[in-house]
Amino acid sequence: MRNAKQPIFLGIFILTLLFGRSTLSAQTVRVEGVVRDSAGAVVPGASIELRSGSYEVETTSDAQGQFVFASVAGLSGLVTAQAQGFGSLQQEWTAGADSRVQLTLVLTPASSHEEVTVSATRTETRLTDTPGSTVALSNTEIAATPALRVDDVLRQVPGFSLFRRSDSRVANASNQGVSLRGLGGSAASRALVLEDGLPIVDAFGGWVYWDRVPRESLQDVEVFRGGASNLYGSDALGGVIQFITRQPGAPAFHLETSYGNEKTPDLSFWTGTRAGKWDVSLASEMFRTDGYILVPTWQRGAVDTPANSKDASVELTVGRKLGDKGRIFGRGNFYTEFRHNGTVIQTNDTRMGEGSLGLDQQFGSGDSLTLRGYGQVQGYDQRFSSVAADRNSESLTDLQYVPEQVVGGAGQWTHLFGKHQTLVAGADIMEVMGASDEQFFSSGTHTRNGASGGRQRIVGLFGEDLIRINSWTVILGARVDDWNNFNASSLCTPVAGTCPSPSVVFPSRSDLAFSPRLSVLRSLNHNFSITGSVYRAFRAPTLNELYRSFRVASVVTTNNPFLNAERLTGAEAGVNFSGLDRKLDLRGTFFWSDIVNPIENVTIDPTANPVLRQKQNLGRIRSRGLELDGVVHVSREVQISAGYAFTDATVVNYTVPPGEVSLLGNYVAQVPRNVFTWEARYWNPSRVMLSVQGRFVGNQFDDDQNQYPLGQFYTMDFQIGRNLTRNLEIFAAAENLLDERYYVANTPTATGSLFNIGPPLLYRIGLRINWPAERQ
């Protein structure tokens, strides 16, 4: 009898196991928790991914740093948390008897070894694995900078400069082209500027409207120095600057407003949220200043008035998730500005509207696709005048209107081969149509009308192979660009005089550019790595250089419809060091660049009134030098950083046209040989937030013949602030604390030189609102 019962009990036991296993497999658990930083503050907007076997799900922490996975099909697994400015965290979890899991995820600040950049390779790459010279600025570092305008923030990066030392507060838009590594002696940019992968360099003129991207919308700014045409084509001759904006998650609102001397109010904000599969963000910025008089006291006359400006921008982005690993979005941007350029008559204004669409889609674990399309319409007005020698009178010489239309698109595919290789391939196209419609005047009389312009189309195909094996990183990339100029003409209609030259229709032109790049990084140990790169890059002449003339003071610079593309051959080598438990980071890079056919403003007749210059292909210039960057994290609150750039940019080959002056051996205009920057920061929001910066800029020349020098100068900036609550901060800031009045322009006149001076001491007081509170 006893033996007969054994099979019955055994069967019941097996059924119990099977039933219990089935019940457990159908059971779901609740996983919840909070994300905090090492100081205990909550971290909103963190990305949390949960895995349990084949089950995967992700979410974002809310304004209180909390997250919930309500129905997880599993009893144990792994959670991965990531947030901007922090290192990644992985934590295992196991459900208790009540089928609930409570987690506290503590993120630590990211070191330079964990920072990620996208500009150098067009795909996410750790900064320490990126060959080349890259500087990354977080939104905390931007807020800690006393400068009000974004271009002034970037001046702390050695090698960065704008044409004529000018800034976006008071400078004419056409003077705001950006240069890296001393490659530009004219106003056209030699570096590509992007916002979330889309170009914001003016396609017609090559300058940059720095204020069209609201400052509070910025999450990071990346500066990649060195030729990057292998990925980005024309404009990336000297590197890439990319603005990366905030991405909406939990409801958030960030605002900065201030008021300063020269009657300067400023307001910038960003707000965004996510609801289900939809996300939306809105950003805007408004600025106005009465400005200051550009001409020094001893040269001023009755016509000299303050150079003032006002601008406004608004940007709306709406996105929607596509499945678990995709997103489509649309963005609209409107920007307007108006400027007085130092006299009553001389003004300019711009109105710009842009729309873009984008798709980001990941396929499986190794493939992703990115698509972008955009269009822009812009109108630019400019008034020029002739100023009398005593500067007590002026007369209108030119009314200029520049209409511009731009369309473009790009596609990129990225494929991962295991853990050690990444392939990138893509294509992009941009077409711009623009003209310069002008009314010319002489002694108050309307003498003639002119219309010059055309169309330009650039199509590029690129590919890149990133290989990471042990301590080696090798990147090989190449790109082919085909650029075409067509429908170009220069027309003249006499009104009360004659035309200086007949109307002409220019033949269509096309050219090809091949831009390869090879970069290598070798990690010697945990502290040292060495890098090296060789590359070619190019820049096609803009429609502005080809077809538009302009006047500054007593200098007229004419266009040149026969310009060729600039071609650069470059090499660089560098050393990176990280020590003292990653509290000390040092980088040094030597670079060498040789440019054939650089486009410069060449003086044709220095004795004429006005002085005559023309945009010409100069022959060949060479820019070589050294970049040094370093930062010491003394403690969590204290940081000291410094940077230095030495740039020797000279003309090494020049065929002298009959009757002109040889430029052989001259320094390239607008390029300082020495730039040194430093910053010391104590950042403890509950006590005080203090930042002090200094910048030294060495001697340079304003002209191609090296006859009009601009002397060296040193400025200091200062900011102090404190949190009133976790979400509200008060601050005061001062730029040019020493009130150094340095020269930014030295232009020839019939009687000698006319100088323009930089800004005086500028100060402001303001408030910042961050909801939810950001990590400082």
Q: Across the structure, where does each feature detected by a protein language model lie?
A:
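Signature of Gram-negative outer-membrane beta-barrel scaffolds
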Residues: 420-525
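Extracytoplasmic beta-strand/coil segments of soluble accessory domains associated
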Residues: 134, 151-202, 219
